[in-house]
C-alpha cells in the first residue's frame, strides 16, 4: 500500500529536478526501480520531510537529556517514526521517545560523528551510527530486505533527515531479526539490543553498559525519573 506522503507509485522513486549540460533542466519525476521493490531515495526523503513534518504533533518528549542539541531533531524523529509505523504496521507501534533515546546513546545528537565499527561493519556514521555494512543492506535490491529499501549513500548519512529515515527503517529490521533469534515477538527494547549488537548478552541475562545508558535516557524521556 502506497503511503500518502510518497510522491510516486509503488515500484518507482522520486528524482528531483537537476540541470543537464546544454539543455533545459529536468524537472522532478518518478523513475522505475529495477527490482520493482519499494525504494526511497534522498531527494524524496527530503521532500517528504519538507512537505509533511512541520504540522505533526506528539512525541518525542521535549527533553534535551543534557545535550545542547537534544531537541534539534525532534521533528524528524516524530515524522519518520510515524511514517515507518504507518508503512510497516507493527503490532506494537514504535515509540518516538525510544528513537530519541537511541540517538542520544549512539551519537549524543552529533549529526556528523563518525566512528570505527569493526572490520566487517566499517564506519558508523551520523545520528543513529549507521554502519557501512548496514548502508549496503538498506540499498541492496537483491539482499535481505524484502521491500521498503532506503537508497542513501555514505555521504548522505551525515544529513539528519536521511540518517533518521534510514536508522528507523533499520531498527524495524532489527526487530525482525531479534524475533527470529528469540523465537517469539521481540520487544522494541530487545530490537534496540539487536541494533546495538547486545542481544546475545541480554539473552544471557547481562546488562551491557550501552543498554543501561539507552534505558536511562528512555526512562527520562517518559518522565519516570
Question: Where would I find each of the regions flagged by the language model?
Answer:
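Short, functionally critical alpha-helical segments immediately adjacent to catalytic or ligand/cofactor-binding
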Residues: 91-113, 130, 167, 193-196
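Short, surface-exposed glycine/acidic/tryptophan-bearing loops
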Residues: 115-141
Amino acid at each position: 500500500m502506497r503511503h500518502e506522503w510518497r510522491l510516486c507509485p509503488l515500484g518507482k522513486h522520486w528524482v528531483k529536478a537537476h540541470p543537464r549540460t546544454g539543455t533545459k533542466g529536468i524537472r522532478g519525476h518518478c523513475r522505475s526501480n529495477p527490482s520493482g521493490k519499494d525504494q526511497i531515495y534522498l531527494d524524496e526523503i527530503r521532500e517528504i520531510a519538507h512537505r509533511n513534518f512541520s504540522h505533526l504533533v506528539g512525541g518525542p518528549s521535549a527533553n534535551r537529556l543534557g545535550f545542547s542539541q537534544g531537541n534539534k531533531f525532534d521533528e524528524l524523529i516524530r515524522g519518520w517514526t510515524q511514517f515507518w509505523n504507518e508503512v510497516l504496521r507493527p503490532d506494537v507501534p514504535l515509540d518516538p521517545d525510544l528513537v530519541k533515546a537511541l540517538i542520544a546513546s549512539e551519537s549524543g545528537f552529533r549529526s556528523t560523528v563518525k566512528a570505527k565499527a569493526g572490520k566487517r561493519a566499517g564506519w558508523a556514521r551520523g545520528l543513529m551510527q549507521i554502519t557501512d555494512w548496514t548502508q549496503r543492506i538498506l540499498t541492496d535490491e537483491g539482499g535481505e530486505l524484502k521491500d521498503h529499501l532506503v537508497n542513501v549513500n555514505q555521504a548522505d548519512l551525515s544529513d539528519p533527515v536521511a540518517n533518521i529515515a534510514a536508522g528507523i527503517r533499520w531498527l524495524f529490521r532489527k526487530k525482525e531479526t531479534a524475533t527470529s533469534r528469540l523465537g517469539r515477538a521481540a520487544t522494541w527494547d530487545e530490537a534496540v539490543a539487536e541494533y546495538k549488537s547486545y542481544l546475545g548478552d541480554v539473552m544471557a541475562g547481562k546488562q551491557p553498559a550501552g543498554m543501561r545508558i539507552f534505558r536511562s535516557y528512555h526512562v527520562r524521556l517518559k518522565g519516570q525519573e
